[in-house]
A protein has these predicted regions:
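M16 family metallopeptidases and their MPP-like homologs
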Residues: 1-23, 29-78, 90, 94-96, ...
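Short, flexible, solvent-exposed loop/turn segments with mixed acidic/basic and small polar residues
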Residues: 44-47, 142-149, 259-262, 360-364
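Short, conserved charged micro-motifs
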Residues: 66-67, 164-168, 223-224, 278-283, ...
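Non-catalytic, conformational "gating/processing" segments within enzyme and secreted inhibitor domains
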Residues: 138-174, 193, 369-370
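Glycine-rich, charged/polar anion/phosphate-binding loops
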Residues: 140-143, 185-187, 195-201, 216-217, ...
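Acidic, glycine-rich loop-and-beta core segments that form the ion-binding/anion-interacting portion
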Residues: 168-172, 180, 206, 213-214
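Bilobed periplasmic-binding protein-like "clamshell/Venus-flytrap" ligand-binding domains
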Residues: 358-374
Length: 384
């Protein structure tokens, strides 16, 4: 139970900072010795803190598994959380946030999050904010990580060259090494969305301008997950309606697309375009035009059929990859869904009906309180 949604306001961004520190040394091995040992075993270890989850992944050749597993146990059970490594990673995060503030795309999305979600954790996103970062300490990062280790909310998964008996044995061994905590982690209150439209203009010394329009969306961990995947597939890529409208028909953007956000709690549906200052206002109008079209008419039969096929193909490919299937299965269980969802997902997507999809998503796409952002080089009359 980690990730942004489980952070308190004063700890925004701490999940990502803790994730960076897990592979920066253990109680027994320095960072250099740990990385050397993993490299000698041909291992790849990644720790990812997202909006709704905290995921530790490790892969290696079977012949090196025993030695790598010993190091993995140290990483998850006895990470060092050294002060020097913390200071380094905090400095890296500080530079990341400063870089985001100067990027039209990142700055626009970060401001949109704040306006859309307010004080809910989704409002500060996975990176957190600079004021939140400055309040974080090494002790807080360590306590946050260890407080996540709740047995009934932790999921272990194994895949590849192993038997079920071996997987059970490794699970028991890893569980025995964990410094478990007993207090169950609970979700915060759901976000309260704006009662009216919100807008912002962010001047930045860049040549390009990012424009976006966003409306409240469904919880992506829920029953609308497959429908949102099809909508996402439809509105991204060179054949998407928004690309054809904004770029091909009006030559107003370098790139366009749709972003989805959410998970345990409702998130957003966001349409964006990267354009120039002179065409930013018109590009934003066209994004709103596309949103209203989707709200009124939904995806056309051609758009729907193509998008559903693309989403189903991606699901089939994911089920064929051990790593991707294992990752998807763990997240499915994390959200309280079925163990075999990854292997049923292609069929679930193909079973989605166009009229049902359009009817289900219309209330979100027609929401009366969009958030609209313009960031980068602005039209002359635009001010913050």
């Amino acid at each position: 139970p980690g990730g942004t949604i489980f952070e308190r306001p004063e700890l925004g961004g701490i999940s990502g900072l803790a994730a960076d520190l897990l592979t920066a040394g253990t109680k027994r091995h320095s960072e250099s010795a740990l990385l050397t040992g993993l490299d000698a075993g041909g291992a790849s270890v990644s720790v990812n803190a997202g909006l709704n989850s905290f995921l530790i992944e490790c892969s290696c050749p079977r012949r090196h598994f025993a030695r790598v597993f010993r190091l993995l146990k140290e990483i998850v059970a006895t990470p060092a959380f050294g002060q020097a490594e913390f200071d380094r990673e905090k400095a890296n995060r500080r530079e990341l946030l400063k870089s985001r503030a100067m990027s039209p795309r990142a700055a626009a999305e970060d401001r949109a999050r704040m306006l859309m979600f307010g004080g809910h954790p989704y409002g500060w996103g996975a990176a957190g904010t600079l004021p939140q970062l400055e309040g974080l300490t090494c002790e807080l990062a360590a306590e946050y990580y260890f407080s996540r280790l709740v047995p009934e909310q932790t999921i272990f998964g194994w895949g590849g060259d192993c038997t079920e008996a071996e997987a059970r044995e490794w699970t028991e061994e890893l569980a025995a090494a964990m410094p478990w905590r007993g207090e169950r982690i609970t979700l915060p209150e759901q976000p309260v969305f704006p009662s009216g439209p919100r807008t912002a203009a962010i001047p930045l010394p860049r040549e390009q301008t990012m424009v976006l329009t966003a409306v409240p969306g469904p919880a992506l961990g829920g029953e609308l997950y497959s429908m949102c995947e099809i909508l996402f597939q439809a509105e991204n890529g060179l054949a998407s309606p928004v690309f054809k409208l904004v770029r091909e028909e009006h030559s107003l953007a370098y790139s366009t697309g749709m972003r989805l956000s959410g998970g345990f709690h409702p998130g957003w549906l966001l349409l964006y375009a990267v354009t120039a200052a002179e065409t930013a206002e018109r590009a934003l109008e066209l994004l709103e035009q596309e949103r209203r079209r989707l709200a009124a008419n939904g995806l056309s039969p051609e758009e729907f059929n193509s998008a559903r096929e693309g989403a189903a193909f991606a699901a089939a490919r994911a089920a064929e990859s051990v790593g991707t299937a294992l990752n998807s299965t763990l997240l499915s269980l994390h959200y309280g869904r079925g163990l075999d969802e990854c292997f049923r997902h292609e069929a679930e997507l193909r079973a989605v009906d166009r009229e049902a999809l359009n009817a289900a998503l219309t209330p979100y796409l027609s929401h009366p309180s969009p958030v609209q952002i313009m960031a980068g080089r602005l039209p002359n009359r635009k001010e913050v």
